[in-house]
Amino acid sequence: MTKNQDRMKSHTMELPRQIVVGEKNINEFGEFLHNLTKPKKVSLISGIHVKKVLRQRIEKSLKTKRIKFVWHTSKDNQISTLNRIEKEVKKDRSDMIAGIGGGRSVDTAKLISFNLDIPFVSVPTAASHDGVSSPFVSVKSDKPHSIVATAPLGVFVDIDIIKKAPSRLLASGCGDLVANIIAVKDWQLGHQKTGEYYGTYSAELAMMSAMMVLDNSSKYAKNGLDARVIVEALISAGVASCIAGSSRPCSGAEHLFSHALDKIAPGKGLHGEKCGIGSIMIAKLQGQDWKKIVKTLKDVGAPTTAKQIGLTEDQIIDALIIAQDLRPERYTILKEVEMTDRKAKSLAKSTKVI
């Protein structure tokens, strides 16, 4: 590898300025915004259920700090919905946007923030993936993978709210974290094969986030998931992507597999669930301990088979075959394997995914 090959292009590290993680602290949201930028008006983007549950407490906290607000409801992540909300937010003339809810609301706020050049804060009510602190957003469009938007200026988490969300969501977050060990291995491979930049620090940060699940899964199986640890690990994973300047530390072949399933079987399984199942198979291709991943996912209550999330054998096989074609510029272990129908079926069966 030449000196020039190993030299990366400069990139900007856009990081959250302030992250607050507390318990039963949603009534401090107004103070959080005030300390962050002293906004006069904030556009609040959330789903119908989240708005119904949190509206009273959030509005009270904003009024205490004399912050005006306008609510907007995000029903799906279709481009048409996003465009509608963006037009409404533009009319608000707010100086802050807040995404309050699951991945959809946070992603919507993130992309609108980027398009309108207005800072935004992430207020996750579920910990199902690492998007709460990353600059990447997933919307239904012609792009087969996440797109770059903007990192949140701040992240505000009430662990009590996270705990009240369905346990399946937290287990999905564990699946997204476990995927980091696949992504980092793929990133190392890409660096070796193409000379692309490899950020040791961001890779280690992503790995540390994954190990919080892998090393503690037996304890979680016995005592239940530790919501705070998992939330903080997901935030750290998102920050790792901010530092890397790309999704590389948290997104490898397992994410390509998940994106392929999004196209083949939309609506089947949560993002982290699909990444977890993908990690089992890709780990075997990489020569990693895939059985440990299976055990970890079972310990945290995440699915390990296609059937558990309503997928057929053919859908798993097809997703493995088309995964690498979705993002040909990203070097992963799938570049080393000419994935055929026979190979895909053998891989999925040998890992008991199908």
From Swiss-Prot:
Keywords from the UniProt entry: Cytoplasm, Lipid biosynthesis, Lipid metabolism, Metal-binding, NAD, NADP, Oxidoreductase, Phospholipid biosynthesis, Phospholipid metabolism, Zinc
A single BP term in Gene Ontology: glycerophospholipid metabolic process
SUPFAM superfamilies hit by this protein: Dehydroquinate synthase-like
Annotated positions binding Zn(2+): D176, H255, H271
A Pfam family assignment: Fe-ADH_2
Subcellular location: Cytoplasm
This protein's pathway: Membrane lipid metabolism; glycerophospholipid metabolism
Catalyses which reaction(s): sn-glycerol 1-phosphate + NAD(+) = dihydroxyacetone phosphate + NADH + H(+); sn-glycerol 1-phosphate + NADP(+) = dihydroxyacetone phosphate + NADPH + H(+)
Source organism, top-level taxon: Archaea
Name of the protein described by the UniProt record: Glycerol-1-phosphate dehydrogenase [NAD(P)+]
Organism of origin: Nitrosopumilus maritimus (strain SCM1)
